[in-house]
Amino acid sequence: MGIRRRRLSLLAFALLGLAACSKPYVAPVLPSPYREQIDAPYDAVWRALVRALALENIQIGAIARDSGVIASEAVPTTIGLYANCGRFGDTQVEGDVQVAYTIFVQAVSETRTAVQVNTRMRSENYARGSGKARPRPPLACASTGRWEANLLDTVRALLRQ
């Protein structure tokens, strides 16, 4: 009985030692949806938004003009520019991420339109640091907000044409 207890204690101590050496995963803080109001009528914003998505080569999964909803298929991007997937210890997660967008468009008045962009990001092919990215358990990622801001800048530019 004493030898068995000693072996279990040794095993538990070894596992604790291994766990102490691993770096904890720190998830990114998920931002709220990206919201802006555009000084243009609903129909003009809708047309410009659809054109902007086409320019970005975003595949549309569902679109409903009457309810003001556009949902994209998942598109790949690299972690860092548009996505933050957290870190392991002090090392940033690097690799690829799949991003899907849901965009809501709503008239605020005859001359103003509200646009909200929700993002859903997930990485299954990443590296812990600058190593080679490989398939791993999925990580939820957060948007940096850059893609959404660029999209609405493109919408505004198309409205000025």
Could you describe each region identified by the protein language model?
Residues 11-16:
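Classic N-terminal secretory signal peptides
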Residues 1-10:
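Bacterial N-terminal signal peptides that target proteins for export
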Residues 22-161:
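Ser/Thr-rich, low-complexity intrinsically disordered terminal regions
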Residues 18-20:
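C-terminal motif of bacterial Sec signal peptides marking the signal peptidase cleavage site
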